[in-house]
């Protein structure tokens, strides 16, 4: 009877804990932020890896790549303003045109090999042709691979495609955003809501074109929005 009661409690609290999971808040990276504050000689090199498609790669109007205006570099710039003693590497393992099913195949070889202190995953924009289920499975494999190595993860919801009305309820980008939110909550990891950043601009009356370099790539103003979402964790 006692064993049955203990089993019930373990199941109850285990299931309750999973169901009540929340997306990580600004305290998620407290250990990393502590490292970023350290001065020489106590500090160490921090590796941030950005894994995904053409947007983190820096493609603006294809084939032009504007690395210094893309959100990984803009994030680095903001981090250095906030943490002047930190030695930070921004490493982009992203590939233009790639989806998460392709990205997961090279995750260990191209991402984990850098011994990251933090991994960003940004694939949803290119995953639409695969569907939600396959995308979820691929992203989940990458999350688990990172967490198995005690590496924190921040997922990014999709930046816009001009062919999608971001203000329309239930559009395909919103569906992928909701899927990623659920994953982030289930694993209690971070989520930078790029989709919401752009949608808010539209619902406030701004023209989405002002933030885009081409139909599916943000310009520098658009990348600034994405970097803003990331910096909430720092």
What are these regions (language model features)?
Residues 159-234:
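Catalytic His-Asp segment of secreted/periplasmic serine-dependent ester chemistry enzymes
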Residues 60-66, 130-134, 165-171:
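Short, solvent-exposed loop/turn segments at secondary-structure boundaries
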Residues 21-93, 107-115:
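Serine-esterase "nucleophile elbow" of acetyl-processing enzymes
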Residues 1-22:
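Bacterial Sec-dependent N-terminal signal peptides
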Residues 118:
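Short, Asp-centered acidic motifs that coordinate Mg2+ and/or phosphate
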């Amino acid at each position: 009877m006692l064993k049955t009661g203990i089993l019930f409690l373990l199941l109850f609290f285990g299931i309750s804990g999973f169901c009540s999971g929340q997306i990580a808040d600004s305290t998620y990276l407290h250990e990393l932020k502590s490292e970023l504050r350290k001065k020489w000689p106590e500090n160490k090199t921090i590796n941030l890896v950005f894994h995904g498609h053409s947007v983190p790669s820096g493609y603006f109007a294809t084939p032009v790549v504007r690395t210094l205006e893309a959100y990984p570099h803009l994030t680095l710039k903001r981090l250095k303003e906030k943490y002047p003693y930190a030695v930070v590497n921004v490493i982009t393992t992203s590939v233009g045109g790639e989806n998460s099913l392709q990205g997961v195949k090279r995750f260990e070889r191209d991402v984990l090999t850098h011994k990251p202190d933090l991994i960003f995953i940004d694939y949803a924009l290119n995953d639409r042709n695969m569907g939600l289920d396959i995308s979820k499975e691929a992203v989940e494999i990458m999350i688990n691979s990172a967490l198995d190595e005690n590496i924190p993860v921040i997922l990014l919801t999709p930046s816009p495609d001009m062919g999608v009305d971001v203000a329309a309820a239930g559009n395909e980008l919103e569906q992928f955003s909701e899927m990623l939110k659920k994953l982030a909550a289930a694993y209690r990891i971070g989520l930078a809501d790029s989709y919401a950043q752009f949608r808010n601009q539209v619902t406030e009356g701004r023209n989405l074109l002002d933030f885009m370099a081409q139909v599916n790539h943000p310009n520098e103003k658009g990348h600034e929005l994405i970097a803003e979402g990331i910096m909430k964790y720092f």
